[in-house]
Amino acid sequence: MNPFWSMSAASGRKRPEADEKTLSGELRTSPPRASAKKQLPSVPKNAVPVTKPASPAMSSQSTNGTHASYGPFYLEYSLLAEFTLVVKQKLPGVYVQPSYRSALMWFGVIFIRHGLYQDGVFKFTVYIPDNYPDGDCPRLVFDLPVFHPLVDPLSGELDVKRAFAKWRRNHNHIWQVLMYARRVFYKIDTTSPLNPEAAVLYEKDIQLFKSKVVDSVKLCSSHLFDQPKIEDPYAIVFSPWNPAIHDEAREKMLTQKKKPEDQHCKSMHVSGLSWVKPGSVQPFSKEEKTMPT
């Protein structure tokens, strides 16, 4: 019999007086027995609960379970979605290509077609934080420093944080950074410049500013065929015009195949009943076919 059950059952019955005396006598003479119920030791004063994080780092990991468990896969998916958005936007004059070695590095080039920087071809690299999209905004660095108020004259880095002071996930995207990099060449902003000389010349001596811009555009064009600074199979490389290669590619881009009109009409056809004869505007002009009996 279970001792716990026998003890609880015995406690519910009233014992005879003689038995109580005998039992009390035994308790006096026999040594004390340990209680059948186990008790936990007392909790120390400085103890920390198990459910409470021991450090802020652990707290950040617990609040972001997706990064903690699926970090690399989540990052890869986010960057793939970002590149898909870039392709869908079809930014005019902007081309990018993710690196072969790291998805956190994208190679790009901007073609400026009019304005002060007309005929400019500026190659750049986008550096994406490894905790994207929860970190800072991506960095955009030109291969050669462009003479511009918002471009650092030494490093060639564009002041991206001016437009994205705080990067907000699901709201800010990399295509917006690329669009901003294109827009700065058409709309000049001189407030808090990274290149004070360019800002002062734009405000006080526009002719000298234009002269330096022309020199900067020519400098970038003279180095257009240089090998990339970063060795990567997917780096953007320019080569001189080769008719044997480029003529055929140009013809394919310029030649547009037009679909026949009847095929276009078929694509625009809506399935369903129609009571109008093709080629007529009179309603109920279509002959109704009778089903054979």
Swiss-Prot record:
Residue spans of biased composition, Basic and acidic residues class: 14-23
GO molecular-function term, one example from the UniProt record: ubiquitin conjugating enzyme activity
Keywords: Apoptosis, Cell membrane, Cytoplasm, Membrane, Protein transport, Transport
Keyword match Transport: yes
InterPro entries from the UniProt entry: Ub_conjugating_enzyme, UBQ-conjugat_E2_core, UBQ-conjugating_enzyme/RWD
Membrane topology: Peripheral membrane protein
Domain UBC core, chain residue ranges per copy: 74-222
Gene Ontology CC entries for this record: FHF complex; nucleus; plasma membrane
SUPFAM superfamilies on file: UBC-like
Chief place where the protein resides: cytoplasm
One GO BP annotation of this record: apoptotic process
Function in brief: May function to promote vesicle trafficking and/or fusion. May also regulate apoptosis.
Family of this protein: Belongs to the ubiquitin-conjugating enzyme family. FTS subfamily.
Name of the featured protein: AKT-interacting protein
